[in-house]
C-alpha cells in the first residue's frame, strides 16, 4: 500500500482519505482467469455497502467517536474519508478495517437495491442530471464513460452479494489503493497502524476494458422536454485523451486553461453573450478527463441554445486562428495558478489531488513547472485540435408544453 502523509502540526484537525483505483467506468475486468462483465452501478453500490460490518455500521462507529465520515464514487475512483480533532488513530483503524473487510448478505443487498433504486428515480427527475448524462451519451459510442455511475434501476437489480465480493477482491487490494493523511499526525504511527490492519499481499494488477472508442461522436444533438421553467443546454467537445504520467497532468492544466480563456467570465465571449442576453450567470464550463476519454463542455440557461453553441464554436476557431491576446493570457494564467494554489489550503483537496496523481502516475506538486511550460500557442493549438465542429455535440432540456 502506498501511504502519503502531509504533516500539519499547527492544525487541530486531521483528515484521512482511503481510496481505490476503481469507479463507475470499471464494469468489465479480468479476474481469476476470465473476463467479468458487471452491471452498471456496482462501484457506487459497493461504496454504500462497505459501511456494513458484522457488528453494525462503521459510519455510526466513526460518528460516535467524534469523526465526520463520508464516501464518494466517481468514474475512476472510490474514496472513503473522515476528519476529526480527537481519537484520530482509533478512527483511522475503523476506516482501514471496514474498507478492507467486506461483509455482504443477500438480504442487505436486496434492501440496498430498494434504497438506491429510489435515489436513481430521484436523480432521473433532475434536469441537470439528464442534461449531463445525455451529453455523455451523445459524445461516446462505446466507452463506459457514457454510463451513469449510479447505474439504472434495472442494472442494479442484477447485483448480488457475489458480485460485490468479486469486485472487492479485484479492486480493494493494497496495490490498487492509497492512503492519504493530512494533519497533526505522526507518519510512523500511521504506517504501523496500516501495517497491522491491512493484508500483506498487494494483489495482482487487474486488466480492464473500457470499450474501443471511435473518434466520431455518437449523436450530434439530444433534446428532452421536462418540468423546467427555462431551457438549459450543454455543448461539449470530444477531446483527445492523454496517457498516464506527466502528459496527463499537462493535458489537465492545458484543458483547464483553454476553458478559462474561451469561456471564463472575463472572456470576450462571455461578456458579449451576457450583454446580448443569450446567456446568464448560470453559464460555465469545465474540462474533464477519465480513463481513455477527455471532454470540454459549457452551458447553462439559454433561450437560444443553438446560437450559444455556434458562438462558442466560432470563438474557439477565432482564437485558434488569430492567437490569444498576451495581456489577457497572462491575466487568466495568474488567476488559474492562484486558484490551484488556494486549493492546497483544503485538506480534502490535497488528499484527492495526491490520490489522482498516484493513480495516473504523476506528481501533482509539479504543477508549477507544468504551468510554466505552457504557452498561449499551446492553448491555441489545443483549441485547434479539439474544438472542431465534428467533435461537438449539443444537449438540451426544454420546458414541457402543457
Which residues fall in each region the model found?
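C-terminal regions of mature proteins
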Residues: 178-181, 319, 330-402
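His/Glu-rich zincin catalytic helix
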Residues: 1-58, 165-272, 309, 392-402
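Flexible, glycine/charged-enriched surface loops at secondary-structure junctions
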Residues: 205-211, 284, 322-332
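Acidic/histidine-enriched segments that form metal/cofactor-coordinating
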Residues: 54-167, 280, 311-314, 326-352, ...
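Extended amphipathic alpha-helical segments enriched in small hydrophobics
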Residues: 296-298, 302-325
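Second-shell loop/turn segments in exported
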Residues: 32, 49, 79-83, 103, ...
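A structural supersecondary motif
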Residues: 234-241, 261-302
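Histidine-acidic residue clusters that define the catalytic metal-binding segment
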Residues: 138-177, 211, 340, 356-385
Amino acid at each position: 500500500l502506498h501511504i502519503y502523509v502531509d504533516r500539519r502540526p499547527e492544525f487541530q484537525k486531521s483528515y484521512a482519505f482511503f481510496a481505490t483505483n476503481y469507479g463507475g467506468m470499471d464494469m468489465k475486468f479480468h479476474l481469476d482467469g476470465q473476463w467479468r462483465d458487471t452491471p452498471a452501478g456496482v462501484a457506487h453500490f459497493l461504496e454504500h455497502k462497505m459501511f456494513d460490518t458484522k457488528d453494525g455500521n462503521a459510519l455510526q462507529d466513526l460518528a460516535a467517536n467524534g469523526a465526520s465520515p463520508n464516501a464518494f464514487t466517481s468514474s475512476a475512483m472510490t474514496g472513503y474519508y473522515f476528519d476529526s480533532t480527537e481519537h484520530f488513530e482509533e478512527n483511522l483503524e475503523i476506516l482501514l478495517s471496514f474498507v478492507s473487510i467486506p461483509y455482504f448478505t443477500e438480504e442487505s443487498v436486496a434492501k440496498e437495491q430498494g434504497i438506491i433504486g429510489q435515489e436513481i428515480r430521484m436523480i432521473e427527475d433532475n434536469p441537470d442530471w439528464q442534461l449531463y448524462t445525455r451529453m455523455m451519451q451523445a459524445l461516446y459510442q462505446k466507452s463506459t464513460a457514457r454510463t451513469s455511475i449510479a447505474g439504472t434501476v434495472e442494472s442494479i437489480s442484477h447485483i448480488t452479494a457475489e458480485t460485490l465480493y468479486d469486485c472487492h477482491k479485484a479492486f480493494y487490494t493494497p496495490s490498487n489503493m492509497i492512503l492519504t493523511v493530512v494533519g497533526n499526525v505522526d507518519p510512523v504511527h500511521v504506517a504501523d497502524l496500516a501495517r497491522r490492519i491491512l493484508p500483506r499481499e498487494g494483489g495482482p494488477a487487474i486488466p480492464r476494458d473500457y470499450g474501443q472508442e471511435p473518434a466520431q461522436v455518437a449523436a450530434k444533438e439530444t433534446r428532452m422536454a421536462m418540468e423546467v421553467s427555462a431551457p438549459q443546454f450543454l455543448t461539449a467537445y470530444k477531446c483527445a485523451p492523454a496517457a498516464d504520467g506527466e502528459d496527463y497532468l499537462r493535458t489537465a492544466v492545458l484543458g483547464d486553461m483553454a476553458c478559462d480563456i474561451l469561456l471564463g467570465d472575463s472572456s470576450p465571449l462571455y461578456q458579449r453573450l451576457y450583454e446580448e442576453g443569450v446567456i446568464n450567470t448560470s453559464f460555465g464550463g469545465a474540462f474533464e478527463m477519465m480513463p481513455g476519454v477527455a471532454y470540454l463542455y459549457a452551458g447553462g440557461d439559454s433561450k437560444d441554445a443553438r446560437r450559444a453553441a455556434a458562438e462558442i464554436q466560432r470563438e474557439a476557431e477565432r482564437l485558434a486562428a488569430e492567437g490569444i491576446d498576451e495581456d489577457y493570457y497572462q491575466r487568466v494564467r495568474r488567476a488559474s495558478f492562484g486558484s490551484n494554489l488556494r486549493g492546497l489550503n483544503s485538506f480534502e483537496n490535497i488528499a484527492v489531488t495526491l490520490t489522482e496523481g498516484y493513480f495516473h502516475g504523476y506528481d501533482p506538486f509539479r504543477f508549477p513547472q507544468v504551468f510554466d511550460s505552457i504557452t498561449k500557442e499551446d492553448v491555441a493549438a489545443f483549441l485547434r485540435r479539439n474544438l472542431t465542429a465534428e467533435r461537438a455535440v449539443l444537449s438540451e432540456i426544454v420546458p414541457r408544453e402543457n
